Amino acid sequence: MAFVTEKEKKKELKNNISNYMKLLFRRSVEEATPQQLFQAVSYAIKDIVVDDWMATHKAYEKKDVKTVYYLSMEFLMGRALGNMIINLKEDKVVREVLDEMGVNLDLLEDEEPDAALGNGGLGRLAACFLDSLSTLGYPAYGCGIRYKYGMFKQKIENGFQIEAPDDWLKDGNPFEMKRPEYAVEVRFGGYVTVRKDEKTGRDRFVQENYQSVMAVPYDLPVVGYGNHIVNTLRIWDAEAIDTFNLDSFDKGDYQKAVEQQNLARTICEVLYPNDNHMAGKELRLKQQYFFVSASVQRAIMKHMENHNDIHGLPEKVCFQLNDTHPTVTVPELMRILLDEYGLEWDDAWDITTRTCAYTNHTIMAEALEKWPLELFSRLLPRIYQITEEINRRFQNEIQAKYPDNQDKVKSMAIIYDGQVKMAHLAIAAGFSVNGVARLHTEILKHQELKDFYEMMPEKFNNKTNGITQRRFLLHGNPKLAAWVTDKIGDEWITDLSKIDKLSVFVDDKKAQQEFMNIKFQNKVRLAKYIKEHNGVEVDPHSIFDVQVKRLHEYKRQLLNILHVMYLYNQLKKNPGMDMYPRTFIFGAKASAGYRRAKAIIKLINSVADVVNNDASIEGKIKVVFIENYRVSNAEIIFAAADVSEQISTASKEASGTGNMKFMLNGAPTLGTMDGANVEIVEEVGEENAFIFGLSSQEVIDFEHNNQYDPKEIYNMDSDIRAVLTQLIDGTYSPENLDLFREIYNSLLETNGYERADQYFILKDFRSYEAAQKKVEEAYRDEERWAKMAMIQTAKCGKFSSDRTIEEYAKEIWHLEKVTL
């Protein structure tokens, strides 16, 4: 709607909220529940957005722009309402209208569940990218799955992680729009028959006896900041083609009557179903093909509505594959070009290899997906045939370039040893292969993907990840955002490089006091959250030392908690020890099937139970595990952190983006030289970070030469020995001495499939402990700490996702900006 004066804006918004309350709930605002109010306000805000949404797509069509389709299994969007209001620049108006109606916007925002469409850094990166694409005016679709329950809602019961369904759609999603007119069919299983085309004499490949589902899109608006551009996140839901078989029902076969419905329902139920068994693996592959096939089919239909030549696809469309999950895009695009448009192989391959680009997010072999050949060929018979042919031709290319070198063929083949290797397929077909931090890209080029880099170096490039300052400062830390704007103006909101203007204030005593006072207020806010949710009193004057991220052994939450155990032992030995009070804050979900990660969560909670209830240490250490870590509580946590724990084993973390969110909010990094930490240290200077541990090259060398024995450290260091012994002597598990035995064994014993202490926790322990001492020393010097904290915020300009997206748009996608 076209607003004129502020008064008219407010009047119209108020009327709309009241009208939606009537339409949706047959109630007045005064009678409404908080959830009903949230719904009515959301619909009223969506009203404003839809006009811009329509105008954006009209402008894209008129200008005939090239569009990027960002394909991702995850989009960790967080809550939509507050972010939308901020990006519309209507925060003041909305707050005033709601105040007049006796409604608090912040409380209203708490009624919105986080959209359960992702889990970790991969999904949050995708969400930041969508925010930047809209804010910069680049035409884009995010494409994913409309999960009914997300990954899971984490509950901590008796210290253990319990997975509960995250039923985020139970009250409906006011921002989504169902688009049944764009539904497409997706086929699984069956077999492929070859028929001669009577007209052309060519072979036609036909999939028969398959099962199929309808992929139905739901569109969510992604609002750019203050520019009226609204892009689309399109998430696909699966519906049965024949929802109910009355004939089977009448014959008493009730299962068969709803078989189609059940097939459809399972596809979109959860993110990352446990794949410790074959049924889980099959469901994951089904999910991947489902959303990829739907997205690619629809993108091509859209292209053909506006252009009648399929050969022009690469000039108008780019598919960006976010990690290996969407790699079936390559054979699916080939299938459509070969089987539906009748192209010859070489033409189809030329189009495909100019349309698909791949982002690698990991060097962890376990995460570079490999599918059992039997499963892949059974579930996706035509896709497998095409992949097989791509592999045959690719192997011929390798042999032509490296005659008589079977090792090269072996290491680079797409199908080998009964497995289909998705990363290899993405690299063979993609015109661009990018890593996500400079160190990560170098490791890919010279270690993990060395053979591919030698054969096709022109494909490889780096795009260091970034975060959106609009979510993680403007929305997540409004007090600091207002202070920054007061000091340097508001250009930083759309150009984070401008935040460097804060550098002139880092030695200013008054500015330091203001900055640290805001930090303290944010710590009070987090302390209140912890008291409400954990029942633990924490002192906002203590150092808030924070590690929040997915639970994985390489991220080394275990190193952190072992150090807490060590500190506790020191305090018990020397009760008078002068130690600055510390609050160690953890937040992490472990995959449902990842047993050891779940044991580490239990260990953190068991240590918390002992330490938090020991009056003799006078509150010098507190340990808190924040349940169900997600975007909405992350915003509160980042704003309050004093220390950012980024302690992955060097060479294992591709980039990390939590490190950037802490930096933006003024928390120095305690970390290894890994991922984007390297680039953060470059920006702030080594004196403004706490770096420890092996370098990535040292880790790689140890892994290759097998010369590390953690038992030597265990035998020589009595403090470490004492901490490890406590894992198995009942100190933290009196009811079950074997509860943490697996963790203990993993640090000291080599078994058939992993080395002892494969993530070098004991090797880095003393270096970590020394770095922690330096943190305490620095924190005691208030002026030094304030300056260090301010430098983090002032120097984070490089780490905006706006910068990252500009690089993708110019160097990979070749998109043009659109203004309204």
Question: Model-derived features: where do they sit?
Answer:
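A conserved ligand/cofactor-binding region detector
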Residues: M1-L820
